[in-house]
Curated annotation (Swiss-Prot):
<comment type="function">
    <text>Involved in cell division, cell envelope biogenesis and cell shape maintenance.</text>
</comment>
<keyword id="KW-1003">Cell membrane</keyword>
<keyword id="KW-0472">Membrane</keyword>
<keyword id="KW-0133">Cell shape</keyword>
<feature type="region of interest" description="Disordered">
    <location>
        <begin position="107"/>
        <end position="134"/>
    </location>
</feature>
<dbReference type="Pfam" id="PF06295">
    <property type="entry name" value="ZapG-like"/>
</dbReference>
<dbReference type="GO" id="GO:0051301">
    <property type="term" value="P:cell division"/>
</dbReference>
<feature type="transmembrane region" description="Helical">
    <location>
        <begin position="7"/>
        <end position="27"/>
    </location>
</feature>
<dbReference type="InterPro" id="IPR009386">
    <property type="entry name" value="ZapG-like"/>
</dbReference>
<keyword id="KW-0812">Transmembrane</keyword>
<keyword id="KW-0132">Cell division</keyword>
<dbReference type="GO" id="GO:0005886">
    <property type="term" value="C:plasma membrane"/>
</dbReference>
<protein>
    <recommendedName>
        <fullName>Z-ring associated protein G</fullName>
    </recommendedName>
</protein>
<comment type="similarity">
    <text>Belongs to the ZapG family.</text>
</comment>
<keyword id="KW-0997">Cell inner membrane</keyword>
<keyword id="KW-1133">Transmembrane helix</keyword>
<feature type="compositionally biased region" description="Basic and acidic residues">
    <location>
        <begin position="111"/>
        <end position="120"/>
    </location>
</feature>
Amino acid sequence: MENWTNEIWVAIGIAFIVGLFIGYIIVRLTKGSVKHQAKTEAELKTVKTQLDTQKAQIEKHFAESAELFKTLINDYQKLYRHYATSSNNLLGEKDQKGLFTQQLITATDKSQNEQPRDYSEGASGLFKENKEEN
């Protein structure tokens, strides 16, 4: 070190300053990408949290819907049993039940014997005559 001249010390100083400058530029360029990467990771965590929350809400919704359907099915079964027992109690004999069935069959037979109409009563549209003019 004793043999080094001023020129070598100047060259070392310039190299040190240039190294600092290049290091500063490299840090400056990569610092933005590091910030961007950290920001992206934070956004990813936020989105994952929201997704997990939404999944939990959907699971809760379907579980609650299933319970409500079970309750609904049980209520309809109770209603059906109630109508069945009430029907047996109120109508009693099978002969009386047949009376209502026979009336229904007779009513449907009468309507089936009639020819279906494919026109409406009276004239309509362009060929309709105005009775006011006559």
